[in-house]
Amino acid sequence: SSAASDVYKRQRYGDGESFAKKFNPSLQVVCAQNVERSFKGNAPSLALLGETYPDEQVNTWIIAQLMDLYKFAGVKEKPTFQQVLELSVMIRVEYYYLKASELLLFFFKLKTGEYGTFYGVVDPMVIMSALIEFKAYRKRQLEKYDREEQERQREKRYEKQDKNSVPFPDHLEFLKKIMESE
């Protein structure tokens, strides 16, 4: 990535710390209240964050979401730092295309129990398989938004055609005149 685009990204999202503050776990609720915007908005993807900030900073941001989840779930057995770090790296690498807003939405849905529950232990495998389910949900949502957009475009075209077209009875009148003049 070019130096100019790096500068732009940093201006837009600030340094790693201000990005982390802006996209903190409390924003999960906002993402859940604005599902369409979470998917279609212009929040940066994990890949873009990786181009803009050192990997450690991106991992730290994901770890903050995970720690928030552990705190929410009230887990008895706290995971080791190594486990949390490894999980954050797996999420960053495997789901590089997810936007920050989508990941926040995922953690919100995870907390609501939509992808199963945690019994005293937050199993990394449960989180990874929940991400697979979320990926399918994301695909359905994006397809739905795409269909809705195509429908809007079609309606616009029809409205435009209607404005530019001659009403049907006038066509018949015109045709009648042509027929009579022959």
Task: Name each region found by the language model.
Residues 104-153:
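Short, cationic/aromatic linear interface patches
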Residues 12-13, 136-182:
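Intrinsically disordered, low-complexity, charge-dense segments enriched in Lys/Arg
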